[in-house]
């Protein structure tokens, strides 16, 4: 009789947490910048605060698309690192710079001409003017943000996640005084309001980019990589094709996920501000808690890729299931706390008792949502480690847009199945679609892991 070696899973779980914790803290620091921008701009006027929110609905989907293209690098680099082919890592990083050069211009143009979207949506003139100014300022930091991500992916790929954490916290520390100067007009500089947030963010992005590059150039653990010996090399279309085959599905999946929640808010807006507010409370809470499994998923990508590079398919499997076990244990805790303190959580955001009651109901659904969300993001992270990103895209598109959105809309806005449920209908759709996604991603992961090692590694060698 064959027994499971739980000690091996325990070892991999510890390594996962060591990689995931800095990723989590970096995410908290990054999200805190957005919170600081919202709070500080809100002290100027409600229009300035609204401009940050409206601008973010344009900025994040597009920038996350560019970010997603570069997420092909961590599994590629971790595989090379694990297989002892560190001399090939620099080439991948340099080709990542070409991905930035090819993507930055179209993304920048789309952001610059976002006024066309605002005209179509008939956004109020004053709000539109502030939002466009904010986005135009942010564009100057776009190349820096993507360059920083490129070199962060290098560090993540070799399982060095602490530098990004430290640099992001330094960026947060700089963001606050720069906001103070540019939003309110200090040190002889005019008051720019929300546009000042965009200026500050662009400067912070360049600051973090320079720090990240300086670290990579001087870190002892990267000297043998010789990334900067010839930082600019000709585009290698074979390498670029392989990276984009991995990164493009991730980019589209990220874009579609962000777009799903943005569209949900728009579809709820005719139902009144109270319903939109309750939805936003549940979404903000879920987004904050989502950072926990997301960090585990990113750590799983790195460690699965490294184990596969070492030729240890059994250890890659142990990493996948260790991440799932840890993630579900965390989900039990966070879901329980969400249920117990749902009213108190809602009271952090608003004082209106009707909104608190509606948000409390949505948070009950959100507690259930956390289990499916954990499984799908961790399984997706493991699949990225196996370089199987197209399956993630197909499953995401099917579950979110063929199942989740139609079901959510039907339950929320129509009487076809039952009286319209409002925001609850969309959240039920989220739970159902995420549960299906989690199931399909687990099936896909198990199918890949069931392959004979020779076939698995032959496929991975073609993708490196």
Curated annotation (Swiss-Prot):
It comes from the Bacteria. The chain crosses the membrane at residues 16-36, 51-71, 97-117, 129-149, 164-184, 194-214, 248-268, 285-305, 321-341, 355-375, 391-411, 423-443. Its main location: membrane. The keyword Cell inner membrane applies. The keyword Transmembrane applies. Keywords: Antiport, Cell inner membrane, Cell membrane, Ion transport, Membrane, Transmembrane, Transmembrane helix, Transport. GO terms for biological process: monoatomic ion transport. Belongs to the multi antimicrobial extrusion (MATE) (TC 2.A.66.1) family. This is Probable multidrug resistance protein NorM. It is found in: Cell inner membrane. One of its GO terms (cellular component) is plasma membrane. Multidrug efflux pump. It is a multi-pass membrane protein.
